[in-house]
Amino acid sequence: MSGACSLSLLSDRVYNKNKMTEKKVKHVGLLHRISSCFTKSSFASCSCDERGQAIDEGAGQILAALEEAGKEGYIVGGCVRDLAMGKVPHDWDITTSARPEEMLSIAALRGWKAIDGGGRRFGTVIIVLGGENYEVTTFRSERYGSDAHRPSEVSFAKTLKEDLMRRDFTVNAMAMDRSGRLYDEFGGLSDIERKRLRTVGDAGERFSEDALRLFRACRFAAQLDFMADSSLVEGMESAFPRVSGLSLERVRQEMDRLLVSKHAARGMDLLVRSGLARCSCRIKEKGAYMEVPILPELSHLVGLPQQKEFHKYDAWYHTLAVLEAVSPEPLLRWAALLHDVAKGMPGIRAIRKGRLTDYGHDKKGAEMARDILTRYRRSPAFTEEVVWLVENHMRFHFFANSPEADAEKWVRQLARDHVFASSEAMAESFLHLKDLCKADIIGCGRPLSATEGHEAFGNYMAELSRRMPVTSKELHYPKDVPAILAPHVAEGMNNLLFRVQNGDLDNAEEALHEAALRFKKRHGM
């Protein structure tokens, strides 16, 4: 029952106190309690008292109240997993033998705010303590039917073991009582030690019950940096037909969480190599369901060779390396994932003078990125920003490596074409493009020092952008210029803007004032 296995916590698993600056002050004490246990020994070999001291104050109060009422209560799932990995949990979930109505009565006696979170159907009551929400759920078992994600029947269970049996992965199927006694029925601690992701029971059954668990497996691999157990991978395919019943909204949510994870490459590799990326989910629009492919466009990159002179890895490993080299922002992670998506495509892949080439993959990739993000129902602004990064990453490399080229013309053209809403937006996009292209270099197997030129060039382009007006509102004209241009203010302003963007006129008060007077004279005003 209790975890008897030894858990070796690596130094990079111990929570860094310097990262606590944005945490609420009340978590600092909890951090010290967790750290004091981990500095002595592993979570598994800590005494019950030491483990019990790591429980959040609010969760501890709820467990104590349940105990006083003669009910069983345990913290469960992700919070126990996080404690075992030396992390401060984000959420504290509690499972109990108490029925929802009993939990509501316990809360009322103590003056706690309690919210019925679907108690009758799912057995959940939300307790609010100190501004934090704690989900308290009655032991339950589930039966699944035709729905790809939701159980068709939820019934209350009698024991903790029954409740733990319904959970997805062993690392999420551990519980701990207020005294610190650990309940690890399925070897979750052992899997944490081995950095292994494994299902509770038969993988095929777990995934077929709830097809969203397929995506959760990929996401947990990315978040925890765990290797998927062979039994898990083998069990995935049997549940693929169930993916068609999942909503795009839920799949997109899991994908976004995966992509911003520290080890996103591990999760994406599982998604693609398992074949899950070739499945489709669905969205309901205008009363009818539409099929939405996950990411089949990525599959052809696996094993796709690249010119050894420039690339250390094949196209897929290169993509994964770039993915992890950029900062974990959705915009940059999507751009990294799709920046080379068109490599190897018909009409793109060729052999020229004995070399593998993919000329035009940036333009074609931008088209594919737009299609992908549009079907994912991402906002137009987000989509176009990713598309711009994919389309221009090779152009950035060219200018960064060609000091003699006139990069300022690029900025002027972007301003004239109104690609961006403001000069600051253009500058931000160049900084994003710089980060993507630096990651692209690192993803070729080159050292960070090889990106110094790109760093300098990207900063230069951002500064040029900030000085380049995109709209007439960004012209530095004196207050009397609109009056001078009247009644042709709009035409006159556009003329001044165009001349500044072309480099024929300085964006300065005196120059713009003189230009306005000349415009007025030419138009006989």
Role assignments for model-derived ranges:
Residues 5, 9-525:
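Catalytic cores of the polymerase beta-like nucleotidyltransferase superfamily
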